[in-house]
Each structure stands twice: as structure tokens, then as C-alpha cells.
Amino acid sequence: MVYSVGLTGNIASGKSTVAEFFSELGINVIYADKIAKELTSKNTPCYQDIISHFGSSVVLNNGELDRKRIRDIIFSNSNERLWLESLLHPVIREKIEEQLIACTSPYCLIEIPLLFNKHHYPYLQKVLLVIAPLESQLDRIVKRDHCTKKQALAILATQPNLEQRLEAADDVLINESGLSELKAKVNKLHQKYLREAKIKQ
């Protein structure tokens, strides 16, 4: 199987931008969140399980899941979050493996927001952690989710702590300056992963 790097980091740390930069360099990127969205689309087995568990209050008028409502529930109740993770994570891991087999680039990047235990993903060779200053994260969440700073802090409070993240990480990318500096850091890591994957340019 292709050499693979797990990309992770807390919400609003800049993971998606980092993933885009790797993609621009010709690297296949697999998005765990995108897979999760497909797995929970209308009338899928996971969709039915979620409705059976949470009830009709999590369904919009068009029959789709009310993802904001579900997010509010799991951010305020750790048991509900664990239930949802135990439903989705095994299936997500399976789908990631299927996409890895089809990967055509020298190595593959897998964006997994909640990755803090590499053992759950035996096909990962490396874990790349993106971290950003707290204020930057809060600003991004407030702008993206149109929420208050207090709500943004509550969202961040549900994320794995930095110590856990660092323990699982092989490489750490600090996103604290502009995009050009971030791009330069990605370029450096790209060269490193090419070497590690034993691929000559």
C-alpha cells in the first residue's frame, strides 16, 4: 500500500489549507469528513441509525440530517459524541483504506480531524499535526460558524488536548504566520515525505 500521512489538528487550525497546498503539489488527499458526510447522506444505513438514536428532531424538512443540531448535541454531551464516533469511525476507516488502494501519487495525505491514536489507522506511516494560536482558531470559528466567542470556546473545549495531539504526532506544523510561510513549510514537508516514500522526483 502507498506511503500515507495522516493530517490532523484541532478545529480551525488550518488543516484544510494545508491539505489544499499538498493537493497543489500533486498529492492525493483523502478527507475523512467528506467520507463521513457521504456515509450519513439520506437513506444510508448510518443515516437510519442516527435517526433511530437521536429521533426526528435531527432531520430537516427535506429529509437530510440537521448537521448543526447534531453538532450542538455532541459538543454538549460527550456520551452522545462517543456513540456517534463508535458508529462512524470503523466505517470511515474502511472507506479510507479503499481509497488508499486507489491512490496514484507518490504518497497519500489523509485528513482526519480526530486523529489522536495512530493504532486505529494501521496504514498510516506518519502523523502530521497542524496547530495554530488560540485567538486565530477562535476568530476562524466565529467567522465560519457565525457564532459567538463563547460558543467557539465550547467547540474548542470538546477537542482533544494539545498534549494528546503532540503524543501522536511525528511532525508538527505551526500555522502562525501568513499563507506564504505556511506554503513554504508544506513544501519542505513534501520533500521530506517524498524522500521517506523512497520516490525520486
Curated annotation (Swiss-Prot):
InterPro entries: Depp_CoAkinase, P-loop_NTPase. CDD domains: DPCK (cd02022). Residues 4-201 form the DPCK domain. Its main location: cytoplasm. The keyword DNA damage does not apply. PANTHER family: BIFUNCTIONAL COENZYME A SYNTHASE-RELATED, DEPHOSPHO-COA KINASE-RELATED. Catalyzes the phosphorylation of the 3'-hydroxyl group of dephosphocoenzyme A to form coenzyme A. This is Dephospho-CoA kinase. It comes from Legionella pneumophila (strain Paris). The lineage of its organism: Bacteria, Pseudomonadati, Pseudomonadota, Gammaproteobacteria, Legionellales.
